[in-house]
Amino acid sequence: MKRYTFLTLAAAGLATIALTSCLDFDSPLDTLTIDQEVVDPTVHRGDPAHIDYNISITEEEFDGVLATLDTYLRQAKGGQYAMRGGKNGDFPGEHAYQRQYSLGPDNYAQYTTVPHYDFMYGTLQSSYDISVEFNPGPNSSYLIVKNAMVPLLNHPAIDSIPEVKAMYLLLFDQASQEITDIHGAFPYDDFLTNKQTAPFTYVGAEHIYKTIIGHIGTITDCLAHYEARPDWYKAKLQRLMDDNFDVCQNKFYGRTGVAEWIRYANSLKLRMAMHCVKAEPQLAHQWAEEAVAAGVIESTDQEFGLYGYQLGFGHPLNMIWISWGDARLSASFESLLMSLGHPYTQGDYPFFKNNGGAIVNTKTGEVLEPDTRIVGLREGIHPGMGQSAATNPMLNYSVFDGDYMAQAPLYLMKLSEVDFLRAEGAIRGWNMGGAAREFYERGIRYAYLFERSEDWQHEMYDALVDDYIQRAEAVPYTYHDPLGMVADEPSVTKIGVAWDEGDSQEVKLEKIITQKYIAAFPNSFEAWVDLRRTGYPRLFPVLNADEGDGTLRYGDIIRRCPFPDTDDASVADIAETGLEALGGEDYQATRIWWDKDVPNF
């Protein structure tokens, strides 16, 4: 299928007519607030989850609705970018992305470690340290999504174009699922219905999950009705979708219709089903089989995300890792990849690079010469000071190759995630439309993070993946810290890669989640969920775990982020409804509804 490329360096018709409020583009601590241009001063509070897809409309009325919603649509488009590090209606950028991912979840998933503690607007003493400056980062991005999409969802005119309402409800709900998994409870109902002022009523993960699953049924019913629409309506809707939805690849392939949106919705349902397999095993089974039967993502051209190669922006992590020196490969990820001989570490041009400069052992004086080996930092270690390798040797630890990362998509839903979900469902005995091995091996083949339309980006991976899939045993590996700050640590990865039907369910699950973890990089949201709900992949214990809120000890992992808001009104709301909705105290060790301390099988 031919793929069309649209390279734009400026965001023409950018999503939001917005002015920044107290935003410093040189600061990693942006407040991420948006003051919307007020065209219609009315605050609409409609029924955002009600979608009447049988509604009829004339061509003239359709054009009138578009004129009425023009500002709202452009504003809502910015919410798509905010799902992956955008702000102010702009494409994803390094400041917002860093606050959303790099200063928290990326470390909790143990993809990365922060190599210096000092930032312009805050400090991070170790991985689980609660920074009042950085802890709100993911929620700040979520509020941008909410502020961009909710006014459109509540505007009465959007009911006349129900497909667009359905699509934005789906996007809002994915963002809501992700922030639920970070904090465990928030005022989802009040936010969705555009409530403007406190008090806000917190609801818990169980309520949010079950509400979203109900929405997905309505959304897919609405989109299935699209085929019954008249041709003029389909043509106008297609132009509207091409102009307003950058997360769907249809316009890049010259493709029409909404079939991919249905697959995306069902894939989200499958994800959420697996999240709650310990909390609601029978319901999880039902939801997962319903999702697969209705059709999930089956190919890479059906994936959803933000594609910098097509849209004209670079991946924010290049600036964060390479230019700023604010993140380095974690020792856990190093050990895992090296134990498995993963393609990211192999070949003439591996994705992860060797140490960037000499590293001198502080105890023995031994020197690791530049460009010797891939080396990561232990999670939880006390980082150095400053962003110069001349004074902070932690900056010489491994980074990725920026040429590969520059054009990497920022996924909302990736084929490999769906395949690994189906593989997990299959080993649980669920009808996933195929065998676990089939999904597992396809998941690995398409796990790479590189831009798919550029062959040179993934040729290295493609050349190595066949041997990788057949690797039956892990390679013996010991992590050695060249600075001598921590003792040597043998790899905790003991499984191979090759699928073996004779393996136990537990070993099969470990293989699936381990490969899913690698495939998700750098999207730490889902990786951290899987680590909490399954205990996989096996990673090194986080050092200095007790330096958070005091509820974690060595060997524990962080189960959630504390509530992000500390203003008086929010504190009152949390006391009134937040803790009850959470089901526990506002601690890092408190488990979210789906995170049950029970066996995987």
Q: What positions do the PLM features span?
A:
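Extracellular glycan-recognition regions
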Residues: 23-28, 135, 536-537
